[in-house]
Amino acid sequence: MQKLMGLVRRCVEDYNMIAPGETVAVGVSGGKDSLVLLQLLAGLRQYSNFKVEAVTIDMGLGMDYSGVRKMCEKLEVPYTIVETQIAPIIFDHRKEKNPCSMCAKMRRGALNQAILDRGIHKIALGHHYDDAVETFLMSLIYEGRISCFQPVTDLDRTGVIQIRPMLYIHEKTVDNFASRMELPVVENRCPVDKITKRAEIKDLVYQLSSTYPDLKERIFGAMQRYPLPEWEPKGRYKRPKDQE
């Protein structure tokens, strides 16, 4: 856990993500990524001067977050669940054929409003190293753009700042940590889970990596060396090596 907290701390410092005394909300979906982020940021509090809260947007899919609530109690992290009808609106009323974009937009809006209601302006999201590589390739292949989400995103119109402290941690490492710590991962009941464009890109990266083992490292490094907007680290970044 110390090694992973070190990677998070380095990412936070490289991109000036958290100011002293600040309160950061963690967007907790119940998936392994957000739970690992919550665990690591909660642990990092003892070394850095900031506070952590957890916020979940209940999509209206009947998911059980009782395990997450117990985890938050153990970590002494305030936990808020906001109940919505986002899933029924998208799948039952609108019957969207391509629901992912609208779902993400509605979920982000609900999450931003939830933290603002609590007087918080910074939200930590659980995107990791592999997510960044896959998002870059999705933009290139599906949209013809050189683009990716930013480590720190200032949503000017909302007053919310998004941060992604796990960008130096590989997905495999996240999976292993979640399993080892027996984190209370919530079953995803989304009807289109694992049949998205991201899943297609993940499979493509897996196939290409068998021939080009350093593919992900080269893409991630290129994003920083010839930086996309806001991707050049301010600190002394070193490329994450094999973490297992």
What do the predicted segments below correspond to?
Residues 1-134, 142, 172-180:
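ATP-dependent adenylation/nucleotidyltransferase module used to activate substrates
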Residues 51-52, 130-210:
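Catalytic subdomain that performs nucleotidyl-dependent activation
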